[in-house]
A protein has these predicted regions:
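Intrinsically disordered, low-complexity regulatory regions
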Residues: 1-64, 92-93
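Short, charge-rich amphipathic interface segments used for partner binding and complex assembly
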Residues: 43, 54-86
Length: 93
């Protein structure tokens, strides 16, 4: 397929090395998502135990692992987007 970016306003044509780099960045997404799912499953298991142990429930409420997991998900998505923009170098907002 011909380089599509020349038809997208604000994007330049990418050379093969840049396309390869973009594909490496994009390949990280599913790997990172898999780790996020593992952490989510771990936290869910902790909450299951915590409902039967008040001290553990209080600890989890104070630690806020669900909050931090959500923050990590968003930050990692933003990080991957920033990497792709660093390679593609669009000139539009």
């Amino acid at each position: 397929m011909d380089n599509q970016h020349r038809k997208i306003s604000g994007y330049r044509e990418l050379i093969q090395a840049e396309i390869d780099l973009m594909n490496k960045i994009k390949a990280l997404g599913p790997q990172i998502e898999a780790v996020l799912v593992e952490v989510a499953n771990h936290v869910t298991a902790q909450w299951s135990v915590a409902w039967q142990a008040e001290d553990e429930r209080e600890r989890l409420q104070m630690a806020g692992p669900d909050y931090w997991l959500g923050q990590a998900r968003g930050d990692l998505q933003v990080g991957l987007m920033k990497l792709t923009r660093a390679v593609a170098q669009p000139t539009t907002f």
